[in-house]
């Protein structure tokens, strides 16, 4: 969290070095939208509207603040990380058929956006950090595939318990699946 606290602080500094939380949350929102976190994921079932944090840039940088996403929205985000910048609309459908098994419609992935301007080196560093997190966590020892991931804890209030979160993808070298639980 210290790294992301510092990142949230640095994003909030103007050219003279003055701290402005709104500047930081605006920058975070810009990138969150590029990852597709500013809209529903595309699933064919009812889904909550996402909320990109609009206050407390330092807390928002570690995923707290007023961020609010469904698991499917986070899955879409981590799939974008896995494939290095293409945001897809999610779907539960591969095809529809009639009662005889004849294909009525096949569903292809729809691209909702791309993250331009992110270097291969940056994606490599993000992937390696996520691989290292999984490799250094005893809960993941013994996996037969190299996995990349990130844990998190959503804190709602003193009256509600914390929510554990894991997002990841595998195989890390050539991702085939992204998960959020």
Each predicted region: which residue ranges?
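Beta-lactam-recognizing serine transpeptidase/beta-lactamase-like catalytic domain environment
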Residues: 1-180
């Amino acid at each position: 969290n210290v790294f992301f606290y510092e990142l949230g602080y640095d994003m909030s500094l103007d050219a003279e070095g003055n701290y402005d939380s709104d500047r930081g949350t605006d920058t975070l929102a810009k990138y969150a939208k590029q990852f597709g976190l500013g809209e529903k994921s595309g699933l064919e079932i009812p889904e909550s509207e996402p909320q990109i944090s609009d206050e407390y840039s330092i807390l928002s940088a570690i995923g707290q603040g007023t961020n609010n996403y469904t698991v499917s929205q986070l899955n879409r985000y981590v799939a974008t990380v896995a494939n290095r910048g293409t945001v897809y609309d999610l779907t539960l459908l591969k095809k529809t058929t009639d009662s005889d098994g004849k294909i009525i419609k096949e569903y292809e992935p729809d691209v909702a956006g791309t993250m331009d301007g992110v270097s291969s080196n940056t994606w490599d560093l993000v992937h390696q950090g996520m691989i290292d997190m999984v490799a250094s966590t005893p809960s993941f020892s013994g996996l037969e595939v190299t996995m990349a991931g990130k844990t998190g804890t959503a804190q709602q209030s003193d009256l509600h318990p914390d929510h554990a979160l894991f997002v990841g993808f595998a195989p890390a070298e050539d991702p085939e699946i992204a998960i959020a639980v």
